[in-house]
């Protein structure tokens, strides 16, 4: 499997879990925009694309308005060819609380975290090790994390990012304080 067809999950509006759906699909190179846009009941995406070592990009608008998605732990971890992330990839995720722990762990080809990546995710509480081991990461844009509702865990977010040269202003955005 090298690509996922557009609208692949559109008929699964009642699905609540996409854990390990494509985990280990080492030939998968591309995923379409708005892949989960109609999966409004999805609560967990844990390890959904983990170890997809040929995957090159996280597309724009991956989620629609999904107010129930809470767990994105390790969603793209160990995707060693992942080079780009669209700035609005996660803009629809706004559950009551949530975790993005290890979301891009060991994505060694990732060069930049785009400005405002998690800016619309005010209710996420756990960003532990989100970019740990991203050894190719050179730049982190401004206003990445929205901490308005009290992100409580940000341990090791950039641990082992040995190429990191630039971090933007206000990466831990808190617009309500």
PLM regions and their residue ranges:
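Solvent-exposed loop and capping/linker segments of extracellular ligand-binding repeat ectodomains
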Residues: 1-177
């Amino acid at each position: 499997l090298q690509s996922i067809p557009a609208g692949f999950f559109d008929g699964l509006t009642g699905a609540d879990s996409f854990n390990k759906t494509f985990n280990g699909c080492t030939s998968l190179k591309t995923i379409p925009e708005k892949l989960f846009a109609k999966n409004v009941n999805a609560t967990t995406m844990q390890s959904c694309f983990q170890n997809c070592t040929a995957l090159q990009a996280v597309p724009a608008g991956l989620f629609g308005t999904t107010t129930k998605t809470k767990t994105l732990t390790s969603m793209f971890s160990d995707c060693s060819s992942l080079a780009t992330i669209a700035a609005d990839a996660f803009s629809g995720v706004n559950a009551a609380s949530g975790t993005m722990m290890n979301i891009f762990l060991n994505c060694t080809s990732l060069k930049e975290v785009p400005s405002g990546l998690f800016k619309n995710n005010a209710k996420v509480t756990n960003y532990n090790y989100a970019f740990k081991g991203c050894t190719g990461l050179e730049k982190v844009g401004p206003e990445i994390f929205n901490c308005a509702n009290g992100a409580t865990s940000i341990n090791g977010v950039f641990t082992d990012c040995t190429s990191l040269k630039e971090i933007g202003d206000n990466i831990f955005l808190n617009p309500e304080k």
